[in-house]
Amino acid sequence: MKGKITIISAICAILFGGIQANAQFRNGASFADLDDSETVRALKEHVSTISAAVMEGRKAGSEGERMTAEYVTEVFGRYGLDVLSGKDGDIFGIRQESGDTLTSRNVIAFLQGGDKALRNRYIVIGARMDNLGSDTMTIDGRTVERTYYGANGNASGLAMMLELSRMLRTNRQLLGRSVLFVAFGASCQTFAGSWYFLNRAFSDVKEIDAMINLDMVGTGSSGFY
């Protein structure tokens, strides 16, 4: 959790200081005062909700992915952002080899920059919503179902994006460029949600100055999951 706070602070420094700013923070600083902070509590709540058993691993096109999109939409709205994708998300379809269509969605929220010369330039902050879902394997002749709940992949990135949106909304008067927050559907393996955003949903791609992708930020260098 301390690592998440450091990353959030660094990203805020870059956004408030401009694209070329360098974020600086002390090594070895004490984070004890952050243990019970509002941000830490919110991060834990987001991760717990998004990686809950009811989400069933959030496989692309699943009910769990849809419920995650609904949750992200609700939080963006509660935090005071303009949700551009509507209550159902920005829905798109993916044709499968079987001929069936997989239905997924992106969630897009917006904060307008305050600089008249820069507000039509954009920084995109994104995180994928979907994970691997579940599968079955045979152990000692017994079929066992495994669910990949995805606390790190990628509930951690979504949680950080949501809290960044809250912080930037609170301090929006310091923003020069506008910021787009995008929770990508069907992007764990095929990157379909990010492709759809760039090629179908957002027309001002040339006005994007930077993109920050938040993916699997929950463990640092200590592990993969």
What are these regions (language model features)?
Residues S85-G89, N120, G176-V179, D209:
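Short secondary-structure junction motifs
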Residues V47, S51-K59, V72, Y79-V83, ...:
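Sec/Tat-exported extracytoplasmic proteins
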Residues L34-K44, K59-E70, R119, R142, ...:
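Soluble non-cytosolic domains of exported or imported proteins
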Residues I19-M67, V72-D82, N120-Y122:
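N-terminal hydrophobic or amphipathic helices/low-complexity stretches enriched
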Residues I50, F76, E97-I139:
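Acidic/His- and Gly-rich active-site-bordering loop/insert found
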